Amino acid sequence: MSGMYQDLTGPEILTELTEESIVLLPIGAIEQHGPHLPLSVDYVIADEMARAVLEKCGKEIDLWVLPTLSFSKSNEHSWSPGTISLEYKTLMAVLNDIALSVSNKKKKKI
């Protein structure tokens, strides 16, 4: 079985996800893409790509997609209004915490 991680209940996490499960974390920044595009371009692409991968591969592999992380390291765009950026250490700490939370549920492939 495959699907969206956040659609499972707590008890389902223990029964549906196994050590063979692959958990995908899409990451898309909130940053400028010029005056003609919204700040969410990277987020939308990452979210839709993850859903497409799930649709295409979810019957062949045990794949679970986490909610898309909408913040990343975007300090190169800090000059632009609206950009939200995490420091490298902060982003790595967030990714580590997410991985530990997921792998704590006996899932190893993130």
Please name every model-derived segment.
Residues 2-107:
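N-terminal catalytic or cofactor-binding beta/alpha core of small enzyme domains
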Residues 110:
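Acidic/His-rich segments in extracytoplasmic proteins that coordinate ligands and/or metal ions
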